[in-house]
Amino acid sequence: MSSTVTATDVLRDAYGRIRDALPGLIGRLDDRTLLWRPDRDANSIGWLAWHLTRVQDDHVAGVGRVQQVWTREGFHDRFGLPYEVENIGYGQTSAEVGAFNVTDVDLLVGYHDSVHTMTMRVLDELEAASADGGSDGDSGYARVVDAHWDPPVTVAVRLVSVIGDAQAHLGQIGYLRGMAQRR
């Protein structure tokens, strides 16, 4: 076994921690707690779990140039939300957040599990492309995925950004859970 730790190893670990944390945070919560909002403009636990998974699905699928799990595996239909298929929750109004009504923890966790599996596949492909040296200039972690920023956003930056976003939302879920259980 090699003692070398690669960027892919670190990313796998970070995404694995997200995957491991979510069920423990939302499991066994009742419907009321999943949808509770501390005020009319706040996000609910259920919405945050959905949103962090939608962002990971959207961004990692984009990096991997694959179809999102949301549509490929029919989660858009299973969730039955009143949002456009491409909606990931970013910039939603308070009314749109309030329209989130999913209380099926197994569905939320199952969607995240499927996104995690896709994420691991994309990381495997990126590792192979990086090992190849990215000789075509369009593969691996250095590939630019969004040139609208200065500096342009690379695959590596996008993947780390998704991790940071998900970790922030997991913290919000934990905080909301504590608040909801004390009301």
What does each model-identified segment do?
Residues 12-16, 23, 33-89, 124, ...:
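Short, contiguous alpha-helical
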